[in-house]
Amino acid sequence: MNRTHDRLHDGQAGAVGMMIIIWLVVVVLLGVTAIDAGSIAFTKFRLADVASSASTQAANAFRSSPNVSSACQAAEASILVDDSSAKLAKKGCVVDAQTGVVTITVRKEATTIIAGRLSFTKHFTKVSATETNGPTSL
């Protein structure tokens, strides 16, 4: 009777150990997912600030000399200063010559632990932000 009782407890100990391992794996996966999501969100918010600053710089440059090319160059310079890993998107600098309002679109890949390495989640790491601003009034 004692041996049967010990075997029963051995089987339960294995099941409990397996449940602990499964729960630890689930907790780790949830933690990594939360960190990746936070990184993507932070990158999106930061990129919006970069785009806003660049659009303001470009609008001010356009007000100083109404040249679309120099305004877009000012935007690129602002982006480089604010975040060297962010890039101005193709056709990401649009200047309304009538109003002096500039729309800037900036792209960047968020740094993640897992999302950037998996093909079905990689597109979530490619972040873009578009901001529109006019020249500052002094």
Language model: regions and residue ranges:
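Compositionally biased, intrinsically disordered low-complexity regions
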Residues: 13-19, 94, 102, 118, ...
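Short amphipathic secondary-structure patches
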Residues: 55-110
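Residue-level preference for non-acidic, small/hydrophobic
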Residues: 51, 104, 129-131
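Low-complexity, flexible helical/coil segments
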Residues: 11-13, 88, 129-130, 138
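Low-complexity, S/T/G/P-rich flexible repeat/linker segments used as non-globular hinges
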Residues: 2, 112-138
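Alpha-helical assembly-interface signal, strongest on the long, hydrophobic N-terminal helix that forms
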Residues: 2-73
